[in-house]
Swiss-Prot record:
EC number: 2.1.1.199
Keyword Methyltransferase: yes
Gene3D superfamilies tied to this protein: Putative methyltransferase TM0872, insert domain, Vaccinia Virus protein VP39
GO cellular component, one term: cytoplasm
Keyword annotations: Cytoplasm, Methyltransferase, rRNA processing, S-adenosyl-L-methionine, Transferase
Name of the gene: rsmH
Residues reported to bind S-adenosyl-L-methionine: 35-37, 55, 82, 100, 107
Listed SUPFAM superfamilies: Putative methyltransferase TM0872, insert domain, S-adenosyl-L-methionine-dependent methyltransferases
Catalytic activity: cytidine(1402) in 16S rRNA + S-adenosyl-L-methionine = N(4)-methylcytidine(1402) in 16S rRNA + S-adenosyl-L-homocysteine + H(+)
Protein name: Ribosomal RNA small subunit methyltransferase H
Length: 302
């Protein structure tokens, strides 16, 4: 880990605008990362007296701790997943909750983490929390072909999931898949020439699938969507930034269903996406989508 802060937060102005008329005093950032959004919120809203920032990535927390030193006394950082945050959070605690889903550019550029195609000789890890859990390498070397194929299909929506799973199992009979290069070699004959000519790397969906499975991102997102409204005070707002349809779809439907139940209203009737200027400066932002839900002011009789 370096002392620099390479991660550029996305949709910052748009995220701030969703809380502009609210003047929040308590805020929860469940993916604080390197502290980019936190810095923007704490600077823009002097009204925030208590900002809880959590993340599964200890390296990111170390960076955010340095970045947020000017706001000492207003910030509390903790190493926690969504389910752990839920266990710690009482009802009606926050005016706002923010989640920035997916992998960060900081994690991608740290080749030791195994998230990037570029780190060929680096271990195929992919854990956001390197202190626990199984690695992508362990998944590929231990699960049955059918299980690996299901991961590629369900979490990557990879059209060639059967062929890719078969290639992995065939390769590991001769050599364990331990590095990024091993996975590339294992699947080298899977993709047709038109996939190889595209700008998007042919292994993109496979990497996505492994990352989501290793980090149980779907289960963690479900915890967030099932619980975050409970954390909010009446009139509080939940903003979620997603980067792929597997994340955005559940968010969209959860917000719609909560609105239908009378729990509040969707503030982003049209999903918010980055401007051309932002995507030019930060290409990673191009697939970002921001949605926001406001909890009802009405207090339940239950």
């Amino acid at each position: 880990m370096t002392d620099s802060i390479p991660h550029i937060p996305v949709l910052v102005k748009e995220s701030l605008s969703l809380f502009q008329d609210q003047h929040p005093t308590t805020f929860c950032d469940v993916t604080v990362g390197a502290g980019g959004h936190a810095e923007a919120f704490l600077t823009s809203f002097p009204s925030i007296e208590h900002y809880d920032g959590s993340d599964r990535d200890l390296s990111a927390l170390a960076l955010s701790e340095k970045r947020l030193l000017p706001f000492k006394g207003r910030v509390c950082l903790r190493h926690a997943s969504f389910d752990e945050v839920n266990a710690l959070t009482p009802d009606g605690m926050y005016d706002g909750v923010l989640a920035d889903l997916g992998v960060s550019s900081m994690q991608l550029t740290d080749l030791e983490r195994g998230f990037s195609f570029q780190g060929e000789d680096h271990p195929l890890d992919m854990r956001m929390d390197t202190s626990r859990g199984i690695t992508a390498s362990e998944v590929l070397n231990s699960l049955r072909e059918e299980e690996i194929g299901e991961i590629f299909r369900k979490y990557g929506e990879e059209p060639l999931w059967r062929s890719a799973a078969n290639a992995v199992v065939h390769f590991r009979k001769k050599k364990k898949i331990l590095t990024v290069k091993d996975l590339k070699d294992a699947t080298s004959g899977v993709f047709p020439s038109y996939r190889l000519r595209k700008k998007i790397h042919p292994l993109t969906l496979i990497f996505q699938a492994l990352r989501i499975y290793v980090n149980q991102e779907g289960a963690q997102l479900k915890v967030l969507l099932d619980s975050a409204l409970r954390w909010l005070r009446p009139g509080g707002r939940l903003a979620i930034i997603s980067f792929c349809s597997l994340d955005d779809r559940p968010v969209k439907w959860a917000f719609r269903e909560a609105e239908a139940r009378g729990e509040g209203r969707v503030l982003t009737k049209k999903v918010i996406m980055p401007t051309y200027e932002e995507t030019r400066k930060n290409p990673r932002s191009r697939s970002a989508k921001l949605r926001c839900f406001e909890k009802s002011l009405k207090i339940s009789d239950e």
